[in-house]
C-alpha cells in the first residue's frame, strides 16, 4: 500500500508562515480596540454575542457582521480576553490559507508550482500584517479559499454537494465582511461554467440553486436583525437607518467604490471636501502602567509605548504607521475600522485611482512585489494552452479561475474611492497562485522551446526585479539605497545567467529557483517589519515606515483616565452607564480594561443618528446615564452636543484630575478620528 509522504518544503513554508503571523503577539498589548471592546461585551451575554454589540449594555453594534467576532469571542471565553487570544484565530487563518493554496495548485501543476504559490502567499506583506491583528480580513480570505477548494472538488468529482458548500462558504464570508466576500463570485461562476463536465442545462440549474443558497445564507443574519424590534436590540453601527441591509449595501457596499458619503463630521474628519487634517505624528500614545481587568481571573494588558516623532522633522497627515512615510513626504491619511472617509480618495494612503494604482508606491509595497511575475506567467499559460489546447485544457481552466479572481478585484481597487491598504489581502491568493503557475509554465517554455516564448521567464525575472527596485526607491530615507542597488544587480545577474545557460539543462531548474529566491528577498523583509518594528492594529501595513513607530502609533485607540474613572465611580448612583461619550474611541478602553458600560452616542466616529434629544432626555430621566464626556472638536450629532452643553453642569478637570494619576499621556485629551482635542465632563440630571 502506497503511503503519502509529508512535503518537507511545505512544512518549512507553513512554519515560516506561523512564525511571521504569531511571533511576539503574546507580548503585544495593542489590538483594534473597536473590535476588542465588542468581544469583551459579547462574552457577557448571548444578546450581545448574537448582535455583535460594541458595549456591554447593547446600545450599538460594530459596523461588521458577527461571524469572525463570534470566533474571537469563543477564543476569549476559553483563554480569556487578551490581545493574543483574539489575534490567534486570524494568525491561524493566515497559515491555513497558505496550506489551502498549496493543496489547490499541486494536483494540476505539480509540487514545485504549489510550493512557490504557498511561499509567495506566506511572504505577502499585507497578508502577514493583517494576520497579526484582530481585524477580519485574514479569516475572510481563508473562508473564500476554503470555498475555492470545494469548488475545485465539485468540478473534479461532479457532485452538487461540493458546489453548494462552495457557495455556502461565500455566504458565510458575507457575514464576516459583507460585500467584500462577493468579489470572488465572478471567478466561481465562470470556472464552474467552463470546467464542469455536466450539461449546460445542469450547470445553470446547479448554479441557480447555489446562488439561492448563497443569498439565503448571506442575508440570514441581516434579516434576523432588521426584523427584530429596534427597542429590543442594539442600533446598527455606522448605518443611517438602523438597518443591517443598508449597512451592507451602502456603507460596506457602494460607498467603498464611489467614496464615503454617510457618517461624515466636519469637525472630526474634515473629509468631505478633502480638507486638511490634524497632524497625528506629534501626538503621544498612552504610556501609563497599563490597566488590568479580570475575565477568567488573571488577564492584563502590558505597558503602552510612546508613539514616535517623525524623523528629520517631517510630518505625515494621519500616518497610521507612525514613523516616516515613503520618500519622506506627507504620509498617507488613514481612517478607522468603521469610519473616516469622504470623497478624497487619497485620504487613506491608497494612491490615485487609475489602471496603474497597484503599481504606485502607496500600495505596491503591500501587495504588488510579485504582480509583474504573475501577470507574465499568466501570459505564458495562455501561450502554452494556445499551442496545445488538448494537453493544457485543464490547466488553463484553473489558471482562468485565478485570473478571474485577480482581474475584477484588482480593477475594483484601482478605481475604488473608500478602502484601506489592508483590504488588498484579497489579491494575495490569485497573485500567489499565478506566481506558482507562471513559474511552472514559463520554466517549461524556457526549457523546451527555442522561439521567443522561451525568453518569457528571463523577461519576467528582469521586469519584476526592476519593478521591485522602483518600489524600494520610495523608501531610501528609511533603508538607504544599498538594498536597491544590490537587488538590481542580482536581478540583472540572474537574468543574464538564465539567458547564457539556457540550454544547460542541469542548471536551468536551479537557476529558476535562484531567480525566485532573489525576487522574494525584499518581500521577506517587508513581511517581517511588523515583527521587527511593531504593527498598526487598526490599519495594518508592512514596510520600513513602521521603523521606530512603537506599536504603530495607533491613533484610533485611547486609554483610561484613572482620575476620571475614580470620580465617576464614586459619584455613580446606580446609573447603567458610567458615562456617555460621542465616539467608540473614547468608550472602548473603559469597556476593555475596566468592565464598565459606556455609551457611544454616535457610534464609531460620532455621527450615527442613534439618539434624538427627546430620547436622550428619557434615558436621563430613567436614571440610565447622567455624565457625558465630550470633545471640543466633535461636530457630529450637534443637536445632542448642544443640548448637553446647554443643560449640563460642566465638571472641571480639577475636580477629578487629582484623585488618581491618569494613564493618559495628556490629561483630559481625546484621540481618534478628530485628532487630539480637549475633553470636558458634563453632569445632566
Curated annotation (Swiss-Prot):
| One annotated Gene Ontology cellular component of this protein | plasma membrane
* InterPro entries in the cross-refs: LipidA_mod_glycosyltrf_83, RgtA/B/C-like, YkcA/B-like_C
Which molecular function GO terms apply here?
pentosyltransferase activity
- Where in the cell does this protein reside? Cell membrane
Transmembrane stretches, start-end: 6-26, 68-88, 109-129, 154-174, 176-196, 204-224, 363-383, 399-419, 422-442, 455-475, 479-499, 513-533, 573-593
Q: Does the keyword Glycosyltransferase apply?
A: yes
Compositionally biased tracts (Gly residues)? 318-343
Protein name (Swiss-Prot/TrEMBL): Putative mannosyltransferase YycA
Q: Name one GO biological process term.
A: lipopolysaccharide biosynthetic process
Compositional bias annotation for Polar residues: 277-286, 676-685
Amino acid at each position: 500500500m502506497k503511503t503519502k509522504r509529508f512535503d518537507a518544503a511545505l512544512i518549512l513554508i507553513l512554519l515560516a508562515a506561523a512564525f511571521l503571523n504569531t511571533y511576539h503577539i503574546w507580548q503585544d498589548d495593542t489590538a483594534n480596540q473597536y473590535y476588542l471592546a465588542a468581544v469583551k461585551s459579547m462574552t457577557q451575554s448571548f444578546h450581545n454575542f448574537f448582535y455583535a454589540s460594541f458595549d456591554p449594555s447593547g446600545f450599538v453594534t460594530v459596523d461588521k457582521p458577527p461571524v469572525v467576532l463570534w470566533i474571537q469571542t469563543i477564543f476569549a471565553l476559553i483563554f480569556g480576553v487578551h490581545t493574543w487570544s483574539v489575534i490567534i484565530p486570524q494568525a491561524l487563518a493566515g497559515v491555513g490559507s497558505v496550506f489551502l493554496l498549496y493543496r489547490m495548485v499541486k494536483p494540476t501543476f505539480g509540487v514545485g508550482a504549489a510550493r512557490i504559490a504557498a511561499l509567495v502567499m506566506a511572504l505577502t506583506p499585507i497578508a502577514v500584517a493583517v494576520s497579526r491583528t484582530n481585524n477580519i480580513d485574514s479569516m475572510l480570505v481563508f473562508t473564500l479559499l476554503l470555498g475555492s477548494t470545494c469548488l475545485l472538488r465539485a468540478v473534479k468529482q461532479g457532485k452538487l454537494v461540493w458546489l453548494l458548500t462552495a457557495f455556502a462558504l461565500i455566504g458565510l464570508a458575507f457575514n464576516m465582511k459583507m460585500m467584500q466576500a462577493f468579489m470572488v463570485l465572478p471567478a466561481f461562476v465562470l470556472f464552474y461554467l467552463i470546467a464542469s463536465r455536466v450539461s449546460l442545462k445542469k450547470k445553470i440549474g446547479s448554479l441557480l440553486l447555489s446562488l439561492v443558497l448563497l443569498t439565503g445564507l448571506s442575508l440570514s443574519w441581516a434579516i434576523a436583525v432588521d426584523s427584530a424590534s429596534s427597542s429590543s436590540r442594539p442600533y446598527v453601527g455606522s448605518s443611517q437607518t438602523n438597518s443591517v441591509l443598508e449597512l451592507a449595501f451602502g456603507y460596506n457596499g457602494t460607498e467603498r467604490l464611489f467614496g464615503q458619503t454617510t457618517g461624515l463630521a466636519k469637525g472630526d474628519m474634515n473629509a468631505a471636501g478633502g480638507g486638511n487634517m490634524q497632524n497625528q505624528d506629534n501626538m503621544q500614545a498612552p504610556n501609563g502602567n497599563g490597566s488590568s481587568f479580570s475575565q477568567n481571573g488573571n488577564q492584563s494588558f502590558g505597558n503602552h509605548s510612546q508613539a514616535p516623532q517623525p524623523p528629520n522633522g517631517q510630518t505625515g497627515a494621519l500616518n497610521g504607521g507612525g514613523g516616516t512615510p515613503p520618500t519622506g513626504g506627507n504620509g498617507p491619511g488613514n481612517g478607522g475600522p468603521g469610519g473616516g472617509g469622504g470623497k478624497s480618495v487619497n485620504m487613506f494612503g491608497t494612491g490615485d485611482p487609475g489602471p496603474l494604482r497597484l503599481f504606485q508606491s502607496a500600495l505596491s509595497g503591500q501587495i504588488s512585489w510579485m504582480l509583474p511575475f504573475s501577470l507574465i506567467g499568466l501570459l505564458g499559460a495562455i501561450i502554452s494552452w494556445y499551442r496545445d489546447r488538448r494537453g493544457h485544457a485543464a490547466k488553463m481552466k484553473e489558471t482562468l479561475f485565478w485570473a478571474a479572481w485577480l482581474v475584477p478585484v484588482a480593477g475594483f481597487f484601482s478605481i475604488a474611492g473608500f478602502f484601506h491598504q489592508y483590504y488588498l489581502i484579497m489579491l494575495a491568493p490569485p497573485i500567489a497562485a499565478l506566481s506558482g503557475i507562471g513559474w511552472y509554465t514559463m520554466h517549461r517554455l524556457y526549457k523546451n522551446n527555442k522561439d521567443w516564448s522561451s525568453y518569457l521567464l528571463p523577461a519576467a525575472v528582469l521586469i519584476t526585479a526592476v519593478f521591485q527596485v522602483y518600489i524600494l526607491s520610495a523608501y531610501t530615507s528609511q533603508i538607504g539605497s544599498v538594498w536597491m542597488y544590490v537587488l538590481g544587480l542580482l536581478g540583472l545577474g540572474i537574468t543574464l545567467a538564465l539567458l547564457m545557460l539556457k540550454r544547460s539543462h542541469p542548471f536551468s531548474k536551479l537557476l529558476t529557483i535562484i531567480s525566485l529566491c532573489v525576487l522574494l528577498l525584499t518581500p521577506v523583509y517587508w513581511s517581517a517589519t511588523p515583527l521587527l518594528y511593531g504593527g498598526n492594529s487598526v490599519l495594518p501595513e508592512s514596510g520600513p515606515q513602521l521603523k521606530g513607530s512603537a506599536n504603530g502609533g495607533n491613533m484610533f485607540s485611547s486609554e483610561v483616565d484613572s482620575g476620571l474613572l475614580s470620580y465617576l465611580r464614586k459619584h455613580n448612583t446606580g446609573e447603567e452607564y458610567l458615562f456617555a461619550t460621542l465616539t467608540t474611541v473614547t468608550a472602548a478602553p473603559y469597556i476593555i480594561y475596566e468592565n464598565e458600560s459606556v455609551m457611544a452616542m454616535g457610534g464609531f466616529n460620532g455621527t450615527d443618528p442613534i439618539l434624538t434629544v427627546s430620547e436622550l432626555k428619557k434615558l436621563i430621566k430613567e436614571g440610565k446615564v447622567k455624565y457625558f464626556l465630550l470633545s471640543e472638536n466633535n461636530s457630529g450629532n450637534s443637536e445632542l452636543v448642544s443640548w448637553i452643553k446647554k443643560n449640563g453642569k460642566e465638571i472641571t478637570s480639577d475636580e477629578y484630575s487629582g484623585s488618581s494619576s491618569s494613564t493618559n499621556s495628556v490629561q483630559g485629551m481625546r484621540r481618534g478620528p478628530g485628532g487630539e482635542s480637549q475633553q470636558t465632563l458634563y453632569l445632566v440630571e
